[in-house]
Amino acid sequence: MINLRKTHPLLKIINHSFIDLPAPSNISAWWNFGSLLGICLIIQILTGLFLAMHYTSDTLTAFSSVAHICRDVNHGWLLRNLHANGASMFFMCLFLHVGRGIYYGSYLYKETWNIGVILLLTVMATAFVGYVLPWGQMSFWGATVITNLLSTIPYIGTTLAEWIWGGFAVDKATLTRFFAFHFILPFIITALAVVHLLFLHETGSNNPSGINPDSDKIPFHPYYTIKDALGLMLLLLMLLLLALFSPDLLGDPDNFSPANPLNTPPHIKPEWYFLFAYAILRSIPNKLGGVLALLASILILLIIPLLHTANQRSMMFRPISQTLFWILTANLITLTWIGGQPVEQPFIIIGQLAPMLYFLLILVLMPFAGLFENYMLEPEW
C-alpha cells in the first residue's frame, strides 16, 4: 500500500515539515522555542476568538464588557487570564528564541532571520494594540503616549498621529480600529510564520556547534516531536500556574480603573515585555532622538548578520563573545527594570548608561571580540 503521507499533496507538505524532516542530531532544548511560539500563537488566537465574541470595542462599554466576560461568561475569567498571561509567555519564548539565534549564529540564515525580525515587530504591534482594548487607565494613557510619538516625524508627524487616532486624541475611533488591527494581525503573523519555516527548511536547522550537520541527521519524528512535547508540557504548566494562581502579577493595577482622559496616572508604563525599549526611549531627553533610539534598539537585529566577524559560526567555542553575550543579557534585564522605575535619580543615570552599553556591545565590542578570537586561534600566534 502506498504511504498516504508521502503521496497526498497536502499531507506531503506536513510530512516534509514535521515528520520525515532531516534534523541535526545534536540540537538542544534551545531549539524548542520555535514550536512553543507556534503553540503560543494557537492559544492566543483561540482564546482571543472567544473573547472577541463577548467584547465590544466602544469607549462607553469596552471596560464593562471585559468585566462582563470575567463575571458572567462561562469560563470567561479563564479565557481572559489565559489570553493576558499567554502574551507574557509568548514574549518570554520570543526573547529566548532571538537570544538563541544570536548565541549560536542562526542569524547567518539571513532570509529566515529577517522574516523573524519582521515577525517580532508584528507581534509587538499586536500586543500594543491589544493592551489598549480593555480601556483601563494604563491602556488609554499607554496608547496616548506611544501613538503621540508619531508626531515627532518631521512635516507629516501631527497629521499622521491624528490619522491613526481618527480624531484629535485617542478616542472611540482609535479603540475601534485598534480592535480591528488586533483581530487581523495574528493571521498575518501565522502567514509570516509559514514563510519563516519555508526559508528555514531551505537550509535546514543550525545546531549548537555551528558546524554543517549534513553528515549526521535524524528524522524529526519521533525524536524531536517527543522533545517538543516535553517543552509544550512545561510551557502549559507555567502558563496555567500564572493564569490560575496569580493572573494579575504581570498586569498594572491602574487598569482596574476605567480610562479617564482628565486624570493622568503618576507613572505611565507599558507591559513588562516592552520595558527595555521604553527605557531606551526615555533615556534621551529629546522626543525625536528617543523615538529613533527606540526604533534602532529593535531594528539593530537586522544588521547583526553584517556584524559577524568570527570564523566560527556559534559562540560555543568563543569564551570572550560568550562573556559579552551574557553582559548583553544582564544589560537587557537592567533596562527592563529601569523601564518600570520612576524618572528620578539614580534611575536616570542608570537608564542612560544601559542603552549606551547596549549599542556599544552589539555594534562595537562583539564584532571586535570575533576578530580578536580569530587572531587568538591563528596557528602562528
From Swiss-Prot:
UniProt organism field: Pseudantechinus bilarni (Sandstone dibbler)
Principal localisation: mitochondrion
InterPro entries recorded: Cyt_b/b6_C, Cyt_b/b6_C_sf, Cyt_b/b6_N, Cytb/b6-like_sf, Cytochrome_b, Cytochrome_b_C_euk/bac, Cytochrome_b_N_euk/bac, Di-haem_cyt_TM
Chain sites annotated for binding heme b b566: H97, H196
Name listed for the protein in its UniProt record: Cytochrome b
GO MF annotations in UniProt: metal ion binding; ubiquinol-cytochrome-c reductase activity
Known partners and oligomeric status: The cytochrome bc1 complex contains 11 subunits: 3 respiratory subunits (MT-CYB, CYC1 and UQCRFS1), 2 core proteins (UQCRC1 and UQCRC2) and 6 low-molecular weight proteins (UQCRH/QCR6, UQCRB/QCR7, UQCRQ/QCR8, UQCR10/QCR9, UQCR11/QCR10 and a cleavage product of UQCRFS1). This cytochrome bc1 complex then forms a dimer.
Gene3D superfamilies: Cytochrome Bc1 Complex, Chain C
Record's subcellular location: Mitochondrion inner membrane
Source organism superkingdom: Eukaryota
Record lineage: Eukaryota, Metazoa, Chordata, Craniata, Vertebrata
Any further remark recorded for this protein: Heme 1 (or BL or b562) is low-potential and absorbs at about 562 nm, and heme 2 (or BH or b566) is high-potential and absorbs at about 566 nm.
